[in-house]
Amino acid sequence: ADVLDMTPFKSNIALLTRDSVVVLNSSAKEVARLEHNYSDPDMAVYKGRALVYDRTSGDFTLMNSSKILGDGNTGSPIYTAAMGKDGTIAFSLKTSAAQSELCVYNHKLEKIFAWECAQEKIFDISIAPNGKSAALILVGSENAVTYSRLVVLSFKKDNPVVTDIKYDNTLLFDVIYNSSTSIIAYSTDFKKKKKKKGHKEDYSFGSNTLAHE
């Protein structure tokens, strides 16, 4: 079967194909398999857990190497998803009410947070190690010019937006939490030479601000 994605899975490797998720050990021996019937499958992995989802239908299944931990449906098509250290999972959804929506579930698959983004697509998500916040990359277009926003949301606050920085003429494509107070955003600057693949920007932030290190 065609391999759509391959990623480390604890000390093993998880392969996503058009009809299954296969976990192989270091000797390439199959140690787990989950069959799926998703028409447009994708997956997010954190250490020994895999979140397999259908981008079209919104169906998802959470598994480890020995069993299925749970499943559900987001109610909307999925752009992308992420998993956190404490079992938190987050989806970027395509909804009728907004351009995109962040939907967050706890380890019991109970919905704990939602945030609508009116103008931009939530392109990438990283959940903080403590499970209390998420860093997002939003991508939009204004007057035929692409821009990105780096947004940090706190799940517990009435006003969840902790940080919101806009980058004109820039495509941010990957965001990663270094720690609970530090994130790394990877970008491609359209003004730079095409040969340069991209550059990395590190940020550390306190309770309310995000500052370039």
Can you describe what each PLM-predicted range is?
Residues 16, 24-25, 53, 61-63, ...:
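Hydrophobic/aromatic beta-strand positions that recur at structurally equivalent sites within the blades
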Residues 18-22, 56-59, 67, 96-101, ...:
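Loop/turn residues immediately N-terminal
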Residues 15-16, 53-56, 94-99, 142-148:
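Short, solvent-exposed loop/turn segments at conserved positions within beta-propeller repeat blades
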Residues 13, 50, 88-90, 131-135, ...:
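Hydrophobic beta-strand positions that form the internal "hydrophobic ladder"
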Residues 1, 27-35, 66-73, 110-116, ...:
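A short beta-strand motif characteristic of beta-propeller blades
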Residues 141-213:
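Extracytoplasmic/luminal low-complexity segments enriched in Pro/Gly and acidic/polar residues
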Residues 2-8, 37-48, 76-87, 119-129, ...:
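Repeated scaffold domains used in trafficking and secretory/extracellular systems
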Residues 1-56:
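N-terminal "mature head" segments of proteins
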